[in-house]
Regions:
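Oxidoreductase cofactor-interface core, primarily capturing Rossmann-like NAD(P)-dependent enzymes
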Residues: 1-90, 99-108, 151
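A hydrophobic C-terminal alpha-helical subdomain
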Residues: 60, 96-157
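Conserved residues in the N-terminal Rossmann fold of short-chain dehydrogenase/reductase
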Residues: 93
Length: 157
């Protein structure tokens, strides 16, 4: 049995992917996703979905589950962050090449990951139907709910 996850929204808290102030003082999130949707999920919901798989017993043996809480563009994520944080957050779209060149540990791997997500958006999001995750975890959070619970934990750079 396989559970295929999505981008962890917790990366905004723990991995330095939260909004950063630009030269004009306005916050922005930077992703190489152009106008493509990114499947995302709260880390705690991954565990709850896996628990749902286990609760299903032998009926779930050998199955593959793709899970996500929501599929959002970078602009939609920025709008949700703006609402949750009470200050403007822009979406800064960069190319995968630019992202890989940022020079932090893992930038190349993340750039490759995001490039795959963007270039194969329909495949990636289609393999993560929201109703499947919600069936496994009836408490599944969408991005707005995640932000309502965690906005104060997101470091603003």
């Amino acid at each position: 049995t396989l559970v295929n996850t999505s981008f962890y929204w917790d990366n905004l808290i723990h991995f330095g992917m939260g909004p950063k102030k630009g030269p004009d003082g306005v916050l922005a999130i930077t992703l190489p996703m152009a106008d493509k949707r990114l499947s995302g999920i709260a880390a705690e919901d991954i565990g709850k979905c896996v628990y749902g798989v286990f609760k299903g017993g032998v009926a779930n043996v050998g199955k593959t589950y793709g899970i996500a809480g929501e599929h959002l563009t970078g602009a939609q994520m920025a709008a949700a962050l703006t609402k949750a944080l009470g200050q403007t957050v822009r979406y800064n779209a960069v190319t995968p090449e630019q992202f890989r060149g940022f020079g932090f540990p893992g930038a190349e791997d993340l750039g490759n990951m995001f490039q795959f997500y963007a270039e194969f958006e329909d495949y990636f999001t289609g393999a993560r139907p929201l109703d499947v995750a919600r069936r496994l975890n009836p408490e599944l959070q969408d991005f707005a709910t995640f932000l309502a619970r965690n906005a104060g934990r997101i470091p603003l750079g």
